[in-house]
Amino acid sequence: MFLEVFVDPFVYFCVSCIFVPILVDREHLTYADVIGYLTEPAMLFAAALLFIAVAEAKIARWRYRSPPLSTFYERMRARWYLLNGVVIHIFMDGLVGVFKASTLLARNYEKFDKRYGAALGNFEGSAVHVVSLMELFVKGPLCILLYRAYQTHSRHRDALEFFSCVTQAYGTVVYIGEEIISGMPHLDVDYNLEFTTHYLLYFWFAIVFGCLCYLFVPCWWGWQAYKRLVAASSHPARKGMSARAVHPPPPPPSFSFSPLKLKKTK
């Protein structure tokens, strides 16, 4: 099961998000700069949180005697939520996007969206900062809980997944919607379809592919979770109806009245 991470596309997506800034600025970086980038406190915190989340989920699965996830598709979905929670929501969009916890990553964030260059509290970056703070404090922890729910086969998994997918899709709509209705003043748009390395990385990959991915996948998986929730909620009703069909209730009591002879007593 460990080797399957090498064929998981989202693993490559997260790794590329971490290492692309090094490749882009490789001519201006020294070996010490690269080591410093990879050992920044925020980077080490994300790595430690990833390890703790996986270890705690394994312990919980052992404690609840839950079987491991049986299919590659289920394990891939669980990894999607784990990596989204730790790498994307908490580390990149939250700590880096808002608090500039990594200088190199923060510079690259500003290259594809100038709103990330604004200080926290500045009106220009207010929309992305609100979305990113939601990722840091709501969506990130929620995704980690959902990964744990997958590993333990929790009965709360579908509800957590539906809510998580709704928040992810909503955040994407708010993020890109503000730019679309205002003419995209903060994005470096490839209007002339030049497809240079800069545009491929900072527009077509970061904006177009990223927004489509975070709209399509949450809507798809959220819809599946919604259908499972509806089916689960209607199951007790169907079960109750079938039980009443097998064991019909007794007929209501019938009352018959007969005339009573009343004797007049003295």
Regions found by a protein language model. Give the residues of each.
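Short alpha-helical hairpin
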Residues: S16-E27, K111-L120
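Intrinsically disordered Ser/Thr phosphorylation hotspots
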Residues: F10, C14-S16, D33, L44, ...
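First transmembrane helix
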Residues: D8-I22, P41-R63
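Eukaryotic polytopic
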Residues: F2-F6, A47-L49, L69-R238
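N-terminal onset of structured domains
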Residues: Y31-E40
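Non-transmembrane, juxtamembrane loop and terminal tail segments
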Residues: S234-K266
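Juxtamembrane "helix-exit" motif on the non-cytosolic side of transmembrane helices
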Residues: V20-Y31, A60-R63, G177-S182
